[in-house]
Structure formats: C-alpha cells, structure tokens
Amino acid sequence: MSLLTPDSGLLFWMIVSFGIVFVILSKYGFPVIVKAIEQRKAYIDNSLETARQANERLAHIQAEGEKMLAEAKEKQNAVLKEAFAEKERIIEEARKKAVSEAHLQIEEATRRIREEKEKAIREVRSEIADLSIAIAEKVMKEKIGRDKEQQQMIDRLLDEVSFSKS
C-alpha cells in the first residue's frame, strides 16, 4: 500500500514542480494556445459568415434567374400570340383581297361578255338589215313593173309591220 500513498516530501516536490509547470504554461503556453483557438474560432466564424453570404447571394441569383426565365417565357408567349394574331390578320387580309379580286374579275368578265353579246347582236342586226335591204332591192327590181303586185306587196308589208307593233 505504500505505493498508493506518496510521501509528504514527494508530494511537496510534485506540487512545487506542478506549480512551476503551471506558471510557465500559464505565462507562455496558455496564451499561445488560447490565441490559436481564438484565431481558429474567428476563422471558422468568418468562413461560416462568408458561406452564409454566398448562400444568400446564390439564393438571390437563383431567384433572379427564375424571374428572368419567367419574364423570358412571358415575352415568348407574348411574341407567339402576336405572331399568331399577325398570321391570322395576314390570312384574313389575303382572303379578303382574293375575294375582292375574284369579284372584280367576275365583274370584268361579265362586262366583257355583255359587251361582246351586244356587239354580236349589233353585228347580227346589221347583217340582217343589209340582207333585208339586198333582198328588198332584188324584190323591188323584179316587181317594179307590175303595179298590182306592187300594191299587194306594200299592203302585205304594212300588215306585217302593224301586226309586229301590236
């Protein structure tokens, strides 16, 4: 048991040596250790603050990116709607123009047909009149000598004219 209970002299020198070591450490060792711990703590705190700021900036940048993406999609939709409306307007305008041009062409064709018809009728009437005059001249030359036949022909022509007028 003597090993477990130290001598008083040994105890004294252990306390003195421990006190000297403690004084030396407290004067030279602990301040360096405490300073290193405080520097490490400051470095860690600074790193945490920098990381927090970086996370905030990243979140802000992500929010801006999402906002810009939403704006771009909105602009894209607006441009697509505008392009669709423009396409519809152009198609409608082209359709109206085509219908208008078709009506103009139909009217022009109708007018030309009418003119050609009137011209043909005039030509036919002119031909009929010329033929009638030629036939009348031949008939008149033949019958000019016979008074009775001439009178009958005049009466017959007058009757035909009066019937056609009624």
UniProtKB/Swiss-Prot annotation:
Signal peptide: none annotated. GO terms for cellular component: plasma membrane; proton-transporting ATP synthase complex. It is found in: Cell inner membrane. SUPFAM superfamilies: F1F0 ATP synthase subunit B, membrane domain. It comes from the Bacteria. It is a single-pass membrane protein. Keywords: ATP synthesis, Cell inner membrane, Cell membrane, CF(0), Hydrogen ion transport, Ion transport, Membrane, Transmembrane, Transmembrane helix, Transport. One of its GO terms (molecular function) is proton-transporting ATPase activity, rotational mechanism. Its main location: membrane. The chain crosses the membrane at residues 10-30. F(1)F(0) ATP synthase produces ATP from ADP in the presence of a proton or sodium gradient. F-type ATPases consist of two structural domains, F(1) containing the extramembraneous catalytic core and F(0) containing the membrane proton channel, linked together by a central stalk and a peripheral stalk. During catalysis, ATP synthesis in the catalytic domain of F(1) is coupled via a rotary mechanism of the central stalk subunits to proton translocation. Component of the F(0) channel, it forms part of the peripheral stalk, linking F(1) to F(0). Belongs to the ATPase B chain family. F-type ATPases have 2 components, F(1) - the catalytic core - and F(0) - the membrane proton channel. F(1) has five subunits: alpha(3), beta(3), gamma(1), delta(1), epsilon(1). F(0) has three main subunits: a(1), b(2) and c(10-14). The alpha and beta chains form an alternating ring which encloses part of the gamma chain. F(1) is attached to F(0) by a central stalk formed by the gamma and epsilon chains, while a peripheral stalk is formed by the delta and b chains. This is ATP synthase subunit b.
